[in-house]
Amino acid sequence: MLPSLQSLTKKVLAKQCVPVDQYHVLKCCGLWWYDGPITFYVYRHKMFIRSTCFSEGIELNTVLMKAAKENNHDLIRLFAEWGADINYGLICAHTEHTRNLCRELGAKDRLDRDYILKIFFDTTRNKTDSNIILCHEMFSNNPNLKNVDNLDLREEIMWELRGLMEITYMLDHDNSFSNMLTKYWYAIAVDYGLKKAIHYFYQRYTHLHHWRLMCALFYNNVFDLHELYVIERVRMDIDEMMHIACVQDYSYAAIYYCFIMGANINQAMLVSIQNYNLGNMFFCIDLGANAFEEGKALAEQKENYLIADALSLKHYNPVISLLSVIMDPEKINCMLKNYHSINMRVFLDYERR
């Protein structure tokens, strides 16, 4: 769609740093939203909007969805003229009047399955607090997603969260599509350490406190783990927590945290072997695990002969510096951020001979 001279002028104005005493000009031009100015900028060839409700900046296509959900026709027209894909607006248009406007501006009569899936995952790509919260608001309980078989999105989300979903499936009996979407956004927030988004979900979804704890363990987020376990006092069986921490390799901070809280380190070693996680296995040995015979038998049973050979050596010892009790997540992160297993080095040196 060709932009009008008026919309081009607004675009130029939206790129400027306008002083507070001239905000009335922005209001008169329709560049005002949620009690703040609308700012336009380009970053890495993508167009972004910044306003009071999303100070980090949101992609123009995503902001169009919010305008459509709110039936804000002036902003729908403006964002479309600035270059937004009007089909994104159709996803969140819940009234016939707004749907008709989107079609007048060039939207398709009906979005097919593949296009909706593309919009869904393109929108999720920007991992910021504002964007993840907005994605949740735009897609959760969205009747327009019924055009996509829920199974399609379920499969995609299950694939994105495959390790986490596999170990937590039996712990959550609410398998509704809406609940799965919320868990998806929540998991992204914990994975990327998005504090505002994490607390947004924490305040609104009290039934998902354990899900947040599982995500913190799975994604090795020791800061969130500490906040939940010690400050918020969200509780799970400590060995169950250690099991989740061991599923992804090199989750040293989460494993260490569970260890100092009393989890069975030999059991952690076996879970690591079960999941073919060589890094986690050696870290457990660094922490004093000694289930060598049982671990070797398990590795041979799973035909993982590299691990079986590693466990045949008799030269491993606990790392004394790791055995002091540290609870501060900042200190744990600092200690383990660039940690290389001493016992793994023993094995690698032996292999090079």
From Swiss-Prot:
Organism lineage string: Viruses, Varidnaviria, Bamfordvirae, Nucleocytoviricota, Pokkesviricetes
Pfam families in alphabetical order: ASFV_360 (PF01671)
GO BP annotation list: symbiont-mediated suppression of host cytoplasmic pattern recognition receptor signaling pathway via inhibition of IRF7 activity; symbiont-mediated suppression of host cytoplasmic pattern recognition receptor signaling pathway via inhibition of TBK1 activity; symbiont-mediated suppression of host toll-like receptor signaling pathway; taxis
Keywords: Host-virus interaction, Inhibition of host innate immune response by virus, Inhibition of host IRF7 by virus, Inhibition of host RLR pathway by virus, Inhibition of host TBK1 by virus, Inhibition of host TLR pathway by virus, Viral immunoevasion
Provenance organism: African swine fever virus (isolate Tick/Malawi/Lil 20-1/1983)
Oligomer and partners: Interacts with host TBK1 ad IRF7.
Disulfide bonds: none
Protein name: Protein MGF 360-11L
Family (UniProt): Belongs to the asfivirus MGF 360 family.
InterPro entries, alphabetized: ASFV_MGF360
Function field: Plays a role in virus cell tropism, and may be required for efficient virus replication in macrophages. In addition, inhibits the phosphorylation of host TBK1 and IRF7 and thereby negatively regulates the host cGAS signaling pathway and antagonizes IFN-mediated antiviral activity.
